[in-house]
Amino acid sequence: MAKKRIYEVAKEVGVDNKVVVQKAKDLGFDVKNHMSSIDDSQVAKLKSSFQNSAPAEKKAEKSATKNNKIKISVSSIRKNEKKPEENNTPKKSNRRRNNKRRSSDRARDNKERDAKSNTGRPKAAALLQQFKQKQRAEEGQLNREAQKAKKEYHEHLKHPKKEQSEKDNKKTVKESNNKKVEQQVEKKVIGPKILKPSPARLKKNQPADNKEKVTTPRVTIPEAPKEEKRGNGRGRNMGKPGRKGKNQFVNGHSERSDRSERKRRKNKKHQQEQQKPRKQITKRKERPLPDILVYEEGMNAQDIGKLIHREPAEIVKKLFMLGVMTNQNQSLDKDTIELLAAEYGIDAKQKVHEDISDIDTLYDKRMEASKKSKNQIKRPPVVTIMGHVDHGKTTLLDRLRHTHVSAHEAGGITQRIGAYQVRLDDRLITFLDTPGHAAFSNMRARGAEITDIVVLVVAADDGVMPQTVEAIDHAKSANVPIIVAINKMDKPGANPQHVTEELMKYNLIPEDYGGDTIFVNISAKTGQNVDDLLQMILLQADVMELKANPDEMAIGTVIEARLSRGRGPVADVLIQQGTLNIGDPIVVGDTFGRVRTMTNDRGRQVKKATPSEPVEITGLNDVPESADKLVEFKDEKTARSVGEARAQQSLQKSRENVQHVTLDNLFDTMKKENMKEVDIVLKADVQGSVEALQQSLEKIEVEGVRVNIIHSGVGAINESDVTLAGASNAFIIGFNVRPTATAKSQAETDGVDIRLYSIIYKAIDDVTAAMKGMLEPTYEEKVIGNLTVRETWKVSKVGTIAGSFVDKGIVKNDSKIRVIRDGIVKYDGEIASLKRFKDDVKEVKQGNDCGLTIKDYNDIKVGDEFEVYEMQQVEPK
């Protein structure tokens, strides 16, 4: 079946597409728009529905025709006419022909439409034809009247120089005719009125083929010709026919001046419209003046205006009335600002700038604020183990942590602060292990300052010793409670009663004797009463009600610091308040940076550290000093500025400490210049060891000789240290560090003496003996070979076997060996066994592989370096 589209049906019935689409949808057809297709049966139903509603549609069409009548004034007709000079042939006949042609076209179109729409309804078609004939007769009458009025108007234009009386008479006639025409047309015409269209638009709207339907015009004759707007260069002024390029002046003004005047009026109106909302914005209430003006010297009028809620112009005016000539951006001094505040009746108060570079003060303020905070929670106690050397402090801590730290310490003594955490019944206790040697007095003092409880370890078979007394003094000066642990109760010569009596001399009275000091008899070796000691520590912590606020920015204290070859500056810190996270910007002493990594005491990486937790951090720009304060800042920019300012202040202080010669110190200076000096370059593994060794060496008193530390630092001995020592005729002391290969080669070439130590008091004794000239012939170590670990195997009952390659020299089975990792000496001992291809050998030369074990040491990793040496006797020089 042939199908038709909706728009084709709409064209046949003469109805708009939208109406046909809606009608089709009402009939239940599946259509979407005017492009939808329907079959012949649906077309018949659709046309039949429109035929049934034809009378109503015709009525609507009639009303639409009336509403679309166009009102054309005589002035617009005048505009469309050409000049008599240019066109001598009048267009009246043409207009009549056009009107007749339009009427005939309309009649033909109406007949065709009636023939299509009124099929099957002859009565309705006859009535409609009769109505249209009547309408055409009325339109013809109106056209004739309009042509008559137009003719009279042209007669008026041909004789413009007649007397005024004739003009008035014609004017009266035209007005009366105009009114009659208007009265007749207004009865018929209802619709929009278009007055004074431009000639171009009127020409454009005229039909070229004279086939368009033209409605009855509405003719209006004006009382007097008025000035018309220019259009396409054909102007009419004062009702006279104009000519292009002429009659440019009207009433003494040019058209260009009129155009400029209109443009000026338009711009002025636009400016007024823009200024209206601006006036509404400025209308605002003045805010009340503040009671106090907190100002800074150097503020300008704009800054003050923001603080006191006034416009800067008002402030400038006020200052001008006070005799001060200024502008909005000019800085004002203190007196001027106070004078202005007094004029407004405001109290002026100068802002006090806080020195953010003083992190010690900032540390104290945050500590006090945390104590007053409502968000405090319980924190683990920080316990420092103190006492004399070799009284069992580290052994006790090993018992608590189930480790063996003391077995790997040089000389069996602790030479750095160690921080550890122990868990007991779901509660944590942080322990600090301090050195007991006399050289580490500052370390013990720092340990007492950052701790909550001091555990004083005293050997039951040795009693109170000098460092025991020093530890008591440190604890009392820090106002820290003391718990006495009498150790080595497993020994036959243990006498705890004697120890108690000695401690009572220092006002440490046991609870059994009516005092407030807790005494616990323990044995770190066997574990006797160690749990009782922990219970006493927790009991003391509960009494003290230790709390902290973890929601604040972190503050803490550096326990120890060192320089790692692979990681850079490393600091062991104890967090005291707040929480430290990875990425936080911090200032530590004179250094700054952002936390890169954090490692706990078990060697595990952590992302945050809470109060009372010791961690090892990296990311600082330099190695800080021990006991430096750690303060967290909001952004890295502030931390950098504070750190750089503190470094600059430290440099200035060091320069100020240089003593210049005066009359008062002239004799002392001359006496010192005559003294002999022992220049030393000091390098150690951690900052605390550097401080302890430096202070111990400077305290050596030998008449006529003194120690001069020209340089000290942490890390391995490098080329710059050797160069400095060679230029200063000094020797190098290395404590728990080794020289690099290039530094060692350069030292041999330059003849620089490098002394390496792992026990601090041996270094002190050697320097003292050298200063006194009493250095006896000693044994000197001679390195005979270097090895690199390439593989490791763990064998039960044997230990760790290190598969190594001899890089240099020779390895003997009775030689001593030193384990070096990242330039740090990890262990110094003896070779237990040496094998090659599963056979025991006495020696292995350079370029060969071998397997060896180290006596009492199994912590060997791939990449470790072995330094094999022998002790050779050196005759005194």
Swiss-Prot record:
Biased region (Basic residues) positions are 92-101, 277-286
Outline the extent of the tr-type G domain: 378-547
Q: Which domain of life is it from?
A: Bacteria
Any one Gene Ontology cellular component term annotated for this protein: cytosol
- GO molecular function, a single term: translation initiation factor activity
Q: Localized where?
A: Cytoplasm
* Positions of GTP binding: 387-394, 433-437, 487-490
List compositional bias (Basic and acidic residues) regions by residue number: 78-89, 102-116, 135-155, 162-189
- Which CDD domains does the record match to this protein? IF2_eIF5B, IF2_mtIF2_II, mtIF2_IVc
- Annotated region described as G2, given as residue ranges: 412-416
Q: Where is the composition biased (Low complexity)?
A: 123-132
For the region G1, what residue ranges are annotated?
Answer: 387-394
Q: Where is this region: G5?
A: 523-525
Region annotation (G4) maps to: 487-490
Q: Where is this region: G3?
A: 433-436
Membership in a protein family: Belongs to the TRAFAC class translation factor GTPase superfamily. Classic translation factor GTPase family. IF-2 subfamily.
NCBIfam families referenced in this protein's UniProt entry, alphabetically: IF-2, small_GTP
Function text = One of the essential components for the initiation of protein synthesis. Protects formylmethionyl-tRNA from spontaneous hydrolysis and promotes its binding to the 30S ribosomal subunits. Also involved in the hydrolysis of GTP during the formation of the 70S ribosomal complex.
Name of this chain's protein: Translation initiation factor IF-2
Organism, as annotated: Lactobacillus acidophilus (strain ATCC 700396 / NCK56 / N2 / NCFM)
Question: The organism's lineage?
Answer: Bacteria, Bacillati, Bacillota, Bacilli, Lactobacillales
